[in-house]
Amino acid sequence: NHSFIDFFGKEADTFDFIKEDSLDSAYNPSDDELLALVAKELSKGNQKQFIVLHTYGSHFNYRERYPSEDAFFLPDYPVEAEVKYRDNLVNAYDNTIRYTDSFLSRLIHMLEEQHVDAAMLYTSDHGEDIFDDSRHLFLHASPVPSYYQLHVPFLIWMSDTYREAYPEHWQTVTKNKDKDLSSSRSFFPTMLELGGVQTSYRNDSSSVVSPLYTMKPVSYTHLTL
């Protein structure tokens, strides 16, 4: 009983499933463990590498997503799924975001140390409701999604050598940084162009590093803000 992510992952030259590979069923892996795997791949010195990381990120239970010493926003407990604990839940969730910031910073530092043409593209597949309004929605699987579930980050980083090799990508993404975009529409076209992949499936009008990028109307179906 595997997910599509599992099937796609197993098509890679190298793949690791941290939790599934553990003999301990109660094992709760940290996203930090992915960095060791990245270091291992980078050490191979391959000229071309495409690395995909699927993090736990900010999934509930939030307090399991960051080390206790990284609990910056307090109190972060108890975090039962009840409106009365909303402040604690938000603190714990914000701690996961802060931890993800640290994770991405360390990943970028690892890439910088390679002194090669490198680019990183990061996004989330969903946001989160934490009892934000009178509907008292929680998590992210509502039949009718809210703004909080749809609003996600979309982050691009390029190394200095990448910017020098492909200045048009850096200049274009800088011009496009304040434009509206849909991550589900733009992620893969942007990734393909960053990697210089030529395919009939590539749509540069949806790539934010392309001069051809075109903002398209954002449609919400039965969405109440």
Language model region names:
Residues 50-57, 94, 119-124:
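Short beta-strand segments
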Residues 87-98, 142-150, 163-189, 199-204:
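A short beta-strand-to-alpha-helix junction
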Residues 116-117, 123-167:
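Histidine-centered active-site microenvironments of extracellular/periplasmic hydrolases
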